[in-house]
Amino acid sequence: MRALLFTSVVLLALAFVEAKKQTITVKGTTICNKKRIQAEVTLWEKDTLDPDDKLASMQSNKEGEFSLTGSDDEITSISPYLIITHNCNVKKAGCKRVSEYLIPKEKIGGTYDMTYVTLDILSAKDKEKC
């Protein structure tokens, strides 16, 4: 039992030593029906064994512009994604739509410029939250 505990501690320590800090910046402008809108923008990092990590969050400005930078320490490459919570084309009062956007792995370590994020185009990952 002690050997198993010792081995687990050593492996965990090695994982922390091998983990490297990885950073991503994401910027863009939120658009609904050809108009710039404010929206809540959150940068996440997908984890397999534990809950996903929130890297950064902000409200886009009145012009819909946002820029987020986040970092995480991982042994393998991080898997960042963006969640935008908004009310573009939502029919029910008090409800919001949650749109998810994957960030290309080759953008890790740099800036991913999404330019215009057209929220009125539904994707398979969109969900309504009431």
Curated annotation (Swiss-Prot):
Listed Gene3D superfamilies: 2.60.40.3330
Subcellular location as annotated: Secreted
Pfam families (alphabetical): TTR-52
Swiss-Prot/TrEMBL keywords: Secreted, Signal
Disulfide feature: none
Main localization category: secreted
Signal peptide location: 1-19
InterPro entries listed in its UniProt record: Transthyretin-like (IPR001534), Transthyretin-like_sf (IPR038479)
Keyword Secreted (UniProt): yes
Gene Ontology CC annotations of this record: cell surface; extracellular region
Family: Belongs to the nematode transthyretin-like family.
Protein name, per record: Transthyretin-like protein 15
Organism: Caenorhabditis elegans
Gene, per the UniProt record: ttr-15
